[in-house]
Swiss-Prot record:
Subunit structure: Part of the 30S ribosomal subunit. Forms a bridge to the 50S subunit in the 70S ribosome, contacting the 23S rRNA.
Gene3D superfamilies: 6.10.250.3130, S15/NS1, RNA-binding (1.10.287.10)
GO cellular component, as recorded: cytosolic small ribosomal subunit
UniProt keyword RNA-binding present: yes
Protein's name according to its UniProt entry: Small ribosomal subunit protein uS15
Gene field: rpsO
A Gene Ontology molecular function term of the record: structural constituent of ribosome
Comp. bias intervals (Basic and acidic residues): 1-19
Length: 87
């Protein structure tokens, strides 16, 4: 993910100007990285080091989502819908 894409995601999901650390921003950035790594692993099936990284990122995102669900269910529902994480 290049710097411009990262800035775009941060601006889109930020709660206020200069927000880089809110759960929504972190979840959006992790989702982008997960999607990119997923496409990489479809082509390189035996890349187990990257697969482990993917699983760690998914776990980290899950933790952030759980935190957001506990703290503010409306923000949780909004980010889920926006990123299309649930069926």
């Amino acid at each position: 993910m290049d710097k411009a894409k990262k800035q775009e995601l941060m601006a889109k999901h930020a709660r206020h100007e200069g927000d880089t650390g809110s759960p929504e921003v972190q979840i959006a950035l992790l989702t982008e990285r997960i999607n990119h790594l997923n496409s990489h692993l479809k082509e390189h099936k035996k890349d187990h080091h990257s697969r482990r990284g993917l699983l760690m990122m998914v776990g980290k995102r899950r933790g952030l989502l759980n935190y957001l669900m506990r703290e503010d269910i409306e923000r949780y529902r909004a980010i889920i819908k926006e990123l299309g994480l649930r069926k």
